[in-house]
């Protein structure tokens, strides 16, 4: 019986491709979020408190983020957070009311996912602690859209809004930027007195325009 070499070669190529695809599938972990630098199987954020100033002239948010962390793996010795184009002023670990500076460094940047922020957990730290991160965003933040007055409906005041999907929250808050965990949050936002800040959280809709606004989200939401 005559066998066509071309058909045989084609069959071998198909088998090789199938074998390669099986290897890829075997390595895939459906419980892992491949779009975050953080490892939520080792340590998780439970609460986020923001205190931020809005600077329209600089197109910048500045202040601090306070993250309440819970260590899942007792052996883990660092926290890895997602960032993109953030300037970090300082990092501190707070435990039982005591604050101490923390060692930190940026990892290698990625054009799509930003830059991991590695924070060392000192030996002797318990499984629950807070991270205080003083930081500022940049005008290049992919989550923040800054509009001059002429581009707003009223034409008198500037406006800024955030759009964090899909991986852009890390460009205005250093955090575990993943829906794999849920957190509660609160925020204090300071703006020019003529402007009003709003967030998807509990707040007073009749609050006077003082330039300082407070928000609370008691329901855990995707980080």
Please annotate each region the language model reported.
Residues 18-62, 154-159, 179:
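N-terminal, polar/Ser/Thr-rich
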Residues 7-16:
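Bacterial N-terminal signal peptides
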Residues 51-53, 67, 106-108, 118-123, ...:
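Beta-strand-rich interaction surfaces with strong enrichment in secreted/lumenal proteins
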Residues 85-152:
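A surface-exposed beta-strand-loop module
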Residues 134-223:
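Extended, low-hydrophobicity, Ser/Thr/Pro/Gly-biased non-transmembrane segments
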Residues 64-87, 173-177, 185-192:
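Surface-exposed beta-strand/loop patches in extracellular or lumenal glycoproteins
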Residues 1-7:
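Bacterial N-terminal signal peptides that target proteins for export
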Residues 47-49, 60-66, 76-78, 116, ...:
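Intrinsic-disorder/low-complexity, polar/charged segments enriched in Ser/Thr/Lys/Arg/Asp/Glu/Gln
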């Amino acid at each position: 019986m005559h066998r066509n070499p071309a058909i045989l070669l084609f069959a071998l190529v198909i088998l090789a491709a199938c074998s390669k695809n099986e290897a890829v599938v075997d390595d895939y972990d459906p419980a892992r979020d491949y779009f975050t630098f953080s490892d939520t199987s080792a340590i998780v954020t439970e609460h986020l408190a923001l205190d931020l100033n809005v600077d329209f002239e600089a197109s910048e948010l500045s202040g601090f983020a306070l993250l309440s962390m819970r260590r899942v793996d007792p052996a883990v010795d660092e926290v890895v957070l997602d960032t993109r184009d953030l300037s970090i002023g300082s990092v501190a670990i707070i435990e039982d009311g005591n604050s101490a500076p923390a060692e930190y460094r940026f990892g290698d940047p990625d054009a799509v996912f930003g830059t991991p922020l590695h924070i060392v957990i000192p030996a002797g730290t318990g499984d629950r602690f807070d991270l205080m991160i003083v930081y500022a965003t940049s005008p290049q933040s992919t989550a923040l859209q800054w509009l001059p007055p002429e581009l707003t409906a009223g034409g008198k005041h500037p406006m800024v809004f955030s759009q964090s999907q899909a991986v852009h929250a890390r460009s205005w808050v250093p955090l575990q930027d993943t829906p794999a965990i849920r957190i509660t949050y609160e925020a204090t936002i300071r703006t020019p007195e003529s402007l009003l800040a709003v967030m998807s959280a509990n707040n007073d809709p009749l609050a006077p325009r003082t330039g300082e606004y407070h928000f609370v989200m008691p329901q855990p939401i995707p980080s």
